[in-house]
Structures are given as C-alpha cells and as structure tokens.
Amino acid sequence: MDVTWTVKYITEFVGTALLIIMGNGAVANVELKGTKAHAQSWMIIGWGYGLGVMLPAVAFGNITSQINPAFTLGLAASGLFPWAHVAQYIIAQVLGAMFGQLLIVMVYRPYYLKTQNPNAILGTFSTIDNVDDNDKKTRLGATINGFLNEFVGSFVLFFGAVAATNIFFGSQSITWMTNYLKGQGADVSSSDIMNQIWVQASGASASKMVAHLFLGFLVMGLVVALGGPTGPGLNPARDFGPRLVHSLLPKSVLGEAKGSSKWWYAWVPVLAPILASLAAVALFKMIYL
C-alpha cells in the first residue's frame, strides 16, 4: 500500500479526534453533573486516555499515529521525521482535537447545562493545575507546579514511545527494506526476495502492535500517577484545541456556569511537552541510535 502524505494528514486528524473522544469523553463522564459516572473513580479517566492513545495506534500505526505535536517536533528535531511535513501534521492534530471536542460537547450538552462548577466544565476541555483557586495570587504556584508536572510526565511518555517504536511502520517498512536491498544490489523483483521482505515487515508490524498496546498502558499509568496536579495533558493539541473550543462556545451551549478559559495558563501544557519531547528524543537518540 502506497500511503500518500495527504492520507497521513487525514489519519492524524482522525487519530487525534479519537484520542479526545475517548479521553475527554471519560473526563466529561466523571466531571459533569448527572452523568452515569459522575464523581466516580479517577481510573475511568486513566482508562479513557489510555485507550484513546492505544486505539489510534493499533488502528493506524501502519500509516501514522503520532497524534501529538510535541512528539512530531521531537522526532523532526532529531532527524527522525521530515520537517517539510511538521506544520501539516500539527495543523491536522489540532483540528482533530477540536473536532473530537465538539463531538463531546454535542453528546454531553444536557450535562454541561446542569453543571455549576466552572472548573469542572473547563476540565472536560483542557488542563489547569489544582494549585489555582481562581485567585491571581495562586497563578505563579500553579504555573510552576503545572510546568514541572507536564515536563516530567511528557518526558517519560516520549522516551517510552521512542523506545517502544521507531519511524518505520507497516507499509513503510516494506518501502524501506526494498530501497535498502536495491542499494545493496539485490534483485528485488525476485519472488524469493519479496517474500522475505513481506515476512520481515509482517514481523515488524506484529512487534509494533505490542508496542502500541504498551503506549496505551503507559499513558494510562501516567494519567493515574501524574494526572492529579493538572489532569491528563502531555499533548499540546489535546489542550490547545479543546481550550480554543471552550473559549469560542457561548454559555447557551455550555451553561451559565461556563467560566474563564484561563489562557494565562495555556502556554504550560503546550511548551512543557514540547521541551520534554525534544529532550527525551535527543537523549534516546544519543544513547541508543
């Protein structure tokens, strides 16, 4: 299968939308008044985000499944992804996050109207550090704690992601192996050679399937372990896109309790994961590649 870059952009859009539907859908189920899981276990959110990463990775890993601008930038900065496609990937990821969030709002709108806590409403869209109590005096502490939390969690995520996967997936494995063998002077038109390529690619894809499952559980573990201070972030598109949706939607949609989108904090879940990704991918490449 010859996968075009246009297909990859669309896949990043779809994959990021799925992440938001599963992840922020779980948050909405727990945070919004009147839902079946209102005020229930944080594990629901952990499972939601874990599956939100796992499902796109398993479904689209043979095409593309970065679904995170920070990861895309980290790979590009380390020479593992072409810079020519970074902007398109990030745009697709942010738009996918916004689309997924709009679907969540559509499904949960009656419960937004019932909810009286503005932080609970915002929490179903984007993150905010719990040090913040709507007092400007707490903003510095919230910013510092939030940045540290996002950086540590994102570093673990991206280091684990690079360790568990590599740039070649599915059909790309076949293309890479074919070009490599051509460069070595092999006759790739030979049926025996092509059979060997397909066997190797199939084995690599099977290994990556396990890696994708691992990534889902890694995200779930990080949400459970480090989600307490800020909520599940680790992804600039996951925070910025839904936060923008929150700021644009009127109270007639989200209810009279809709509060501030807290743009003063918005740079934290964008910049911290990006810096963590650059550091994690560079460190992994320096040690292992």
UniProtKB/Swiss-Prot annotation:
Entries under PROSITE patterns matching the protein: MIP
Cellular compartments annotated: Cell membrane
GO biological process: glycerol metabolic process
Transmembrane stretches, start-end: 10-30, 41-61, 87-107, 151-171, 209-229, 264-284
Tree of life domain: Bacteria
Motif (NPA 1): 68-70
Entry's Gene Ontology molecular function annotations: glycerol channel activity
GO CC, alphabetical: plasma membrane
InterPro entries found in the cross-reference section: Aquaporin-like (IPR023271), Gla (IPR054631), MIP (IPR000425), MIP/Aquaporin (IPR050363), MIP_CS (IPR022357)
Motif (NPA 2): 235-237
Entry-linked Pfam families: MIP
Main location: membrane
Keyword vocabulary terms for this entry: Cell membrane, Glycerol metabolism, Membrane, Repeat, Transmembrane, Transmembrane helix, Transport
Membrane topology summary: Multi-pass membrane protein
UniProt note: domains: Aquaporins contain two tandem repeats each containing three membrane-spanning domains and a pore-forming loop with the signature motif Asn-Pro-Ala (NPA).
Job description of the protein: Mixed channel protein that transports both water and glycerol.
Family of this protein: Belongs to the MIP/aquaporin (TC 1.A.8) family.
PANTHER family: AQUAPORIN OR AQUAGLYCEROPORIN RELATED, AQUAPORIN-9
Protein name stated in the entry: Glycerol facilitator-aquaporin gla
Organism of this sequence: Lactococcus lactis subsp. lactis (strain IL1403)
Lineage, broadest ranks: Bacteria, Bacillati, Bacillota, Bacilli, Lactobacillales
Gene designation per UniProt: gla
